[in-house]
Amino acid sequence: SIPYPKTVNLKSATDLESIDRLTFPLLIKPSTGKNLNVDVFRTLYFEAKEDYLKAKPNLAKKIEEGVQFVISEYIPGDDTNIYIYTCFRSQSCKILNEWDGKKLTQYPDHFGQFSSASNETSDVVLKQGRLLVDALDVYGIIETEFKYDDRDGQYKLMETTLRSSMPHRTGSISGVKLHETQFKYATHQPVRQYVQEKSQRIHFVPMIHEIPNLVARKGYWKHFKHNVWGADKRVWAIFEWRDMKPFCYSLYPFLKTIVKAVLVRLNFK
């Protein structure tokens, strides 16, 4: 009941016909750990079937040489369409606390880590996240990511991680202390149940990602402006008056990141 991008393994030339059940655009890449002595691309993107048909003879040749591929549906859209559901689930199969939100943008460019995050989300993400966690039947901290596909209006599963990822503080600043939940559960203390703040928009902003994006990505100003000033409440990552050490330690890597972003923008690196 949870939609996800379909994937096909291409192990023989006849498998090249199995893409008919996939929806374009598609991404194809060699399977991990296959014959590295063969000269082969890392990733190919097919916008339409015509593009795939042009590349098909070369793919068949590479398969004959021993290379296997994985081809997957690619969900179009930028990095503003990625949603998060995170929870802590007990060994008795009960979700003790949970929060959901979205990545406002990603860094670097449209991939990788989050650039800023928010408590803005959809009830569909909450429902699908709970269903997936129950189906996995694991315990501990679980995070799932969904990408909104505006072609059919569905939130499609992108990945599941059995740990907290970088935007985890988004949950804490919107009222859900998931790591406290984990600690108290592990130490057999009473666990308090939290309700996430949804009445106001809260943005979690690490400038160590936002500034390089602003420098390196053309047209990023509109996202920067929204991420920094577009919420009812903004929380800076790292920077806190009560404990300035993390901020001070981060200044050097922050400056290095800025210099690298400038070089990228000037095409020097």
Model-derived regions, located:
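Flexible, glycine/charged-enriched surface loops at secondary-structure junctions
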Residues: 70, 139-143, 192-198
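Peripheral (often C-terminal) accessory segments that flank ATP-dependent C-N-forming ligase machineries
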Residues: 184-269
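Glycine-enriched catalytic-core subsegment of oxygenase/oxidase enzymes
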Residues: 173-180, 186
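Glycine-rich phosphate/pyrophosphate-binding beta-alpha loops
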Residues: 104-116, 161-175
